[in-house]
Amino acid sequence: MKTKKIKSIIKKSANQNVLSLLLITVGLALIAVAAYLANTASSAIPTNLVKAPNSKQLTASSIKPSTKAVSSYSVAPTLPKYINIPSIGVNARVLRLGLLKNGQIATPDNIFDTGWYDGSAKPGQKGAMFIYGHVSSWTADGVFYRLKKLKPGDRIIITRGDNKIFTYIVIKSNVYPYNAVDMNTVLSPISPNTPGLNLMTCTGQVIKGTSEFNERLVVFSELS
């Protein structure tokens, strides 16, 4: 009788262990799937369906982030954290941004921040990294106000979440009508075999009766 009871206990314990392992395996699989989807949701969108960012900078906040907010800013190890452009005095955070419901790339809520489109490449990665920054608000110059002054050979320095540095060299700049931006080109590296970084901001004039600038400036650079 005791032997049967012991066997029953052993069998029950074994079944419980198998069930526990199964639940753990399923849980880990779900976590992995969730992480994958979080990292690839925007990148799964074909570039020809992605629209250029809007120009809500005129209504974006112009309150400068505190020194502490900037210095304590953190992101995942492989994502862009800071952008530094020595020739035009840019030192800013790089926020992670996705797509709006209408297919436009979202933009930062503050004119002193920049935004990395998470459907584009990461620092040093094959393809092109895309970063957007505001040119101004109604009352202040934005982070990319002097972007038009960049010239070929200027450096753009990206600090990643793990503090690894990537230096890109400006190749050229293009200006597009606000409603005719070729996002396939903007989201592609200027040299197919070299990781790229393309920056965008608004330029030109404000369209009468709107808060929309009539042009977009894109700076193309590649990893040095």
Please state what every model-predicted region is.
Residues 1-18:
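N-terminal Lys/Arg-rich, disordered targeting/topogenic segments
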